[in-house]
Amino acid sequence: MPGAGSRGPSAGDGRLRLARLALVLLGWVSASAPSSSVPSSSTSPAAFLASGSAQPPPAERCPAACECSEAARTVKCVNRNLLEVPADLPPYVRNLFLTGNQMTVLPAGAFARQPPLADLEALNLSGNHLKEVCAGAFEHLPGLRRLDLSHNPLTNLSAFAFAGSNASVSAPSPLEELILNHIVPPEDQRQNGSFEGMVAFEGMVAAALRSGLALRGLTRLELASNHFLFLPRDLLAQLPSLRYLDLRNNSLVSLTYASFRNLTHLESLHLEDNALKVLHNSTLAEWHGLAHVKVFLDNNPWVCDCYMADMVAWLKETEVVPDKARLTCAFPEKMRNRGLLDLNSSDLDCDAVLPQSLQTSYVFLGIVLALIGAIFLLVLYLNRKGIKKWMHNIRDACRDHMEGYHYRYEINADPRLTNLSSNSDV
């Protein structure tokens, strides 16, 4: 039939165009989908749509107040007035800067996260307003190697701030470098006034450094610019791995109570810009016993009197002090700016000065003698009547004895009285 014949070719052309369109669509879907997810003939259209709209996983989030670099594994939250540690820190962070913010307290578990910040190695918290660091504040940072708390006015540093519950023989702190420069609070914020407050502050820092075995792996410790007057006893007793110790720009007047004997790995000891006047033999002997140490002593007010003689002799022989040629006298006035290495015994007036121990002995002896004299006078005063009677008896006895002696002398001197006395005796 003509009608049927006329419809046949047009219908065939339509089917051909549909087939070509289907092939084009199949090619586009195959090109946009991953090679491993090419659909089979039995795949549904929904699967085609899902495979075509697949996207790569989103990048780790960065806290809004911070700058993050995943390539450098660094997060910087600097001068953002943060009041606490951001909660959404990315787990890849290795170097974290939280400086110049407004955090006043660092509570226990301040860095506890899920997943944990296991790769964090360097943490800088300097320049905040931290006043309190609680026990276990860094407990959930198993990879932490370097911690900087400088320029924070710490009034309460827990004895377990660097330890936490994991500070034991089997699990000491991983810290290798601890920076505590200028953490002393202002004078008006110290407890019990200025001097007592400084003593309490020194004890607080010492307690945190010697808490158990937490810091036995510490190799670098910086305590500069903290106004220390003395180093607390046993401050360094639990730090056997220490290689670098910075105590410059304090107010140290003596190292009498400090012991460096167990710091067998110590390489650098910085004591510049303190108030040291002389170093005693016990300290010099400890330094001499440390195989690799170098001690820096510049800018101290050395007093060049007889007490300096042993130190001068030691300086002339030792190689422990690299800057010894720059050490000069500050007192007395006539010795000002004289180099310590240029001094000899005649310059130090040793003949006119007694050893301090001998001076102390003489003072003590004088006090004892004065006390004995006072007690003796008090006893005499209380027994004055009896003493007066006793003295009268002695006087009478002496008088009788002298009268008898005088009588015998007169008889012996006159022969007539002698014969008379003999006849009388007969």
From Swiss-Prot:
Domain LRRCT: 289-352
Gene3D superfamilies: Ribonuclease Inhibitor (3.80.10.10)
Expression sites by tissue: Highly expressed in embryo and placenta. In adult, expressed only in brain and ovary. Not detected in kidney small intestine, heart, spleen, testis, liver, lung, thymus and stomach.
Pfam family, one: LRRNT
InterPro entries registered for this protein in UniProt: Cys-rich_flank_reg_C, Leu-rich_rpt, Leu-rich_rpt_typical-subtyp, LRR_dom_sf, LRRNT, Wnt_signaling_inhibitor
Notes on the domains: The C-terminus of LRR N-terminal cap (LRRNT) and LRR 1 are essential for the inhibition of the Wnt signaling pathway.
Protein name: Trophoblast glycoprotein
Source organism of this protein record: Mus musculus
